[in-house]
Amino acid sequence: MARIAPNEDSTMSTAYIIFNSSVAAVVDTEIANGANVTFSTVTVKEEINANRDFNLVNAQNGKISRAKRWGNEASKCEYFGREINPTEFFIK
């Protein structure tokens, strides 16, 4: 599965991963608002499934939001995410 770099896909926009009623990370994604996603700060290399490069470890579930109400909190957020598999984000 080929990945498109974020600057080559005009449909990507800034969104927030919401977890426990707060912003867990800021991400660039084309995933719809309200979609469930999985995120983690730890990954491991996938050794079995050739369609995946990495797997998340100790992952949490959150939701995607682009609501303006999260903007102020997101501006203070120090965590940024990158989609490593469909609906799975590695947080740095």
Curated annotation (Swiss-Prot):
BP terms from Gene Ontology: symbiont-mediated suppression of host innate immune response
Cited CDD domains: AcrIF8
UniProt KW Secreted keyword: no
Keywords, ordered alphabetically: Host-virus interaction, Inhibition of host innate immune response by virus, Viral immunoevasion
Activity regulation annotation text: Inhibited by phage protein Aca2 repressor (AC H9C180) both at the transcription and translatio levels.
Quaternary context: Interacts with host rRNA-guided surveillance complex (Csy complex) used to recognize the invading DNA; this interaction prevents DNA hybridization in the Csy complex. Binds to a the Csy spiral backbone.
Functional description taken from the UniProt entry: Anti-CRISPR protein that inactivates the type I-F CRISPR-Cas systems of the host by blocking its ability to recognize target DNA. Inhibits therefore the degradation of the viral DNA by the host.
Protein name: Anti-CRISPR protein AcrF8
Record organism: Pectobacterium phage ZF40 (Bacteriophage ZF40)
